[in-house]
C-alpha cells in the first residue's frame, strides 16, 4: 500500500540552539537499488540522497542547503554524517512513516512454546515516550549538549562511530565515551544513562508477551537496521516493477528508477491488472 504524503517536517534536536528542521523527499528506485546494507554508512548515504532542500520563500525554488532555521532562519549546508545518531534515527523514523506508515508490526517466535508472537506499536508513540523534556538538555552547537546540571557532552558524528566500530566492542566504546565527555576514563554506566535521557536512540528493548503461554521476552528494536533491512527485503519487488514497466511501456532503466516510489508502484499495479490485448 502506498503511503506517499507531504514530506514530514522532522525536528533535528542536536544541531543548533534554535529549532532546525529537515524534510526527506520520497524514495525512488535509484535510492532503493543503491542501498547496500544496514550499517551506519549505508544509512548516511541513503539519508544524504533523500534530504530535500527547503524552498526559498521569495522564489519558491529549492535552495541548496536543507537545514531550515539554522543561523537565525538562514539555511546552511549539513550532511547526514554530521548529525547525531539520535537525529539520524528521527529521519529514519520519518522515512518509515512516509514509506509504510507509523505502525511497526513484526512476529517473533516464543522460546517457551514455539508459537509466533505478534509485536505491534506506533513509532510516533515510542518517540514521544523517549523524548526528554525541553528543560533537560541545552543545545550549544552541532552535537554539543549541556545538561541541566551543567555537564557538557560532544555527541559523535557518523565517522567517529564507524572508526570506533573498527576497534572492537570494548575499545570502541571506550573511545566514544572519552570523546563524548572529554575525560580519559568516564563512568560508562552513568554516561549511558545520561545520554539515554539527553539524546535517546530508537534502539530499545521491548517486552513481548506470548498470548498462548504468557511467557515474556525482551525484543530489540533498532530503527536503522529495521528500516534499511525492510528496504533490502523489497529489492526483488523493485526489480520486478522495473521489468514490468520496461516491458509494458518501453521505458529505460534510468527513466523508471527516477520515478517516485508511489508512482512506480501504482503504474506497475495498473499494468499487472490490465486485461490482455486481442490479436
Language-model segments: what does each one mean?
Residues 67-68:
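Glycine-biased, low-complexity coil/linker segments
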Amino acid at each position: 500500500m502506498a503511503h506517499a504524503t507531504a514530506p514530514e517536517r522532522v525536528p533535528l534536536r542536536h544541531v543548533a540552539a534554535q529549532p532546525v528542521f529537515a524534510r526527506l523527499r520520497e524514495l525512488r528506485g535509484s535510492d532503493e537499488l543503491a542501498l547496500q546494507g544496514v550499517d551506519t554508512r549505508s544509512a548516511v548515504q541513503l539519508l544524504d540522497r533523500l534530504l530535500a532542500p527547503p524552498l526559498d520563500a521569495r522564489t519558491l525554488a529549492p535552495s541548496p542547503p536543507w537545514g531550515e532555521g539554522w543561523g537565525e532562519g538562514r539555511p546552511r549546508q549539513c550532511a547526514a554524517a554530521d548529525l547525531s545518531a539520535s537525529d539520524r534515527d528521527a529521519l529514519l523514523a520519518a522515512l518509515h512513516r512516509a514509506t509504510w506508515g507509523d505502525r511497526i508490526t513484526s512476529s517473533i517466535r516464543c522460546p517457551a512454546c514455539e508459537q509466533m508472537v505478534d509485536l505491534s506499536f506506533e513509532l510516533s508513540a515510542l518517540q514521544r515516550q523517549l523524548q526528554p523534556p525541553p528543560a533537560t538538555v541545552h543545545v550549544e552547537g552541532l552535537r554539543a549538549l549541556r545538561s541541566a546540571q551543567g555537564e557538557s557532552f560532544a555527541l559523535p558524528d557518523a565517522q567517529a562511530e564507524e572508526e570506533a566500530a573498527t576497534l572492537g566492542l570494548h575499545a570502541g566504546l571506550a573511545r566514544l565515551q572519552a570523546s563524548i565527555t572529554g575525560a580519559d576514563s568516564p563512568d560508562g554506566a552513568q554516561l549511558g544513562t545520561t545520554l539515554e535521557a539527553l539524546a535517546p536512540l530508537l534502539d530499545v528493548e521491548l517486552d513481548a508477551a506470548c498470548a498462548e503461554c504468557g511467557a515474556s521476552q525482551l525484543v530489540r528494536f533498532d530503527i536503522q537496521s529495521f528500516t534499511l533491512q525492510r528496504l533490502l527485503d523489497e529489492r526483488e519487488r523493485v526489480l520486478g516493477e522495473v521489468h514490468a514497466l520496461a516491458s509494458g511501456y518501453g521505458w529505460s532503466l534510468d527513466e523508471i528508477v527516477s520515478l517516485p516510489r508511489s508512482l512506480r508502484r501504482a503504474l506497475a499495479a495498473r499494468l499487472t491488472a490490465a486485461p490482455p490485448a486481442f490479436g
